[in-house]
Swiss-Prot record:
This is ADP-ribosylation factor-like protein 13B. GO terms for cellular component: axoneme; ciliary basal body; ciliary membrane; cilium; cytosol; intercellular bridge; microtubule cytoskeleton; motile cilium. It is a lipid-anchor. It is found in: Cell projection, Cilium membrane; Cell projection, Cilium; Cell membrane; Cytoplasm, Cytoskeleton. Cilium-specific protein required to control the microtubule-based, ciliary axoneme structure. May act by maintaining the association between IFT subcomplexes A and B. Binds GTP but is not able to hydrolyze fit; the GTPase activity remains unclear. Required to pattern the neural tube. Involved in cerebral cortex development: required for the initial formation of a polarized radial glial scaffold, the first step in the construction of the cerebral cortex, by regulating ciliary signaling. Regulates the migration and placement of postmitotic interneurons in the developing cerebral cortex. GTP binds at residues 28-35, 71-75, 130-133.
Amino acid sequence: MFSLMASCCGWFKRWREPVRKVTLLMVGLDNAGKTATAKGIQGEYPEDVAPTVGFSKINLRQGKFEVTIFDLGGGIRIRGIWKNYYAESYGVIFVVDSSDEERMEETKEAMSEMLRHPRISGKPILVLANKQDKEGALGEADVIECLSLEKLVNEHKCLCQIEPCSAISGYGKKIDKSIKKGLYWLLHVIARDFDALNERIQKETTEQRALEEQEKQERAERVRKLREERKQNEQEQAELDGTSGLAELDPEPTNPFQPIASVIIENEGKLEREKKNQKMEKDSDGCHLKHKMEHEQIETQGQVNHNGQKNNEFGLVENYKEALTQQLKNEDETDRPSLESANGKKKTKKLRMKRNHRVEPLNIDDCAPESPTPPPPPPPVGWGTPKVTRLPKLEPLGETHHNDFYRKPLPPLAVPQRPNSDAHDVIS
């Protein structure tokens, strides 16, 4: 009677216990079978599972526990995120591929690094030696020896349980009994020291959040300093270039909801600045065009002066030539009557002194080199109409045998009778 009452009191006490929320981590190398194990525990079919990128989360109910399992990716590049989940975990499920003996050393290094972390040391560890259905899979003792598991858990004071299993052998209620047994053991250890673990996890979670907030502030401060340095460099560059392109390239974010009057004033100011810039550009273009026209005018005037000077020199030469020609004509006219009178009177010839001051007129046409006459154009080359030529009369190569060959009329043309014609018809 007393034993029945004691058992009823124990059952009533357990029934009055509140539901406890527990967070577990499922880690291991890639392709170890973590996601298949988690799906089997949840009651889903564990085959055709894709590799986990990042993490996946499953929720399930086990007795008085609401269990949340974080399935973390096991790739070498993603193992660095494991430490971000250590603070809030009550225990760890480490899945090992017992059929891959070549990666046992890598598995040992990953497990050792995890157990050395201060936020994991002292928490219970469940090791699942998965893929026992494959040929050549290591047994429980071999896995313990390859991983030096006994040494690791004693060094870091972690309660440990190893279970050989196969995640794809069943799911839901038909899940592998070793997986179910190991999960019950892990929850039992957590329930036994739940208060101490809960206090430790609350403390470590607070520290983790404070550390994350501090890192976030440090990142924001680094970003702010980088932006300030970039802004300062842009200002210095704008001052060197003589332009203030900072406001245009990286404008400060403004409130989109502004009074319409301020928006209108701002737009009018922008339009005035644009008009002013356009006017300055036009003025600069006009000054440049004016300088160019003045330069061209000066060059044209200099060319005209040069041509005028040449024309003046040529005019002086022409005037001098005309004066010399007129003087020679006058002298010839004065000399002609004297010669006629001398011939008429038949006087003795007078000796005339040779005048040295006479100047021959300058004949520009004689001085200019005669332009050579261009050679006649070559006969056109190409197709053309041939000239009409009369060919000689053809003669026979030898004497004919008949003397009366030439001019003899041809005999009449004999037309043979055709059948069925009028001439061929004969009436008897």
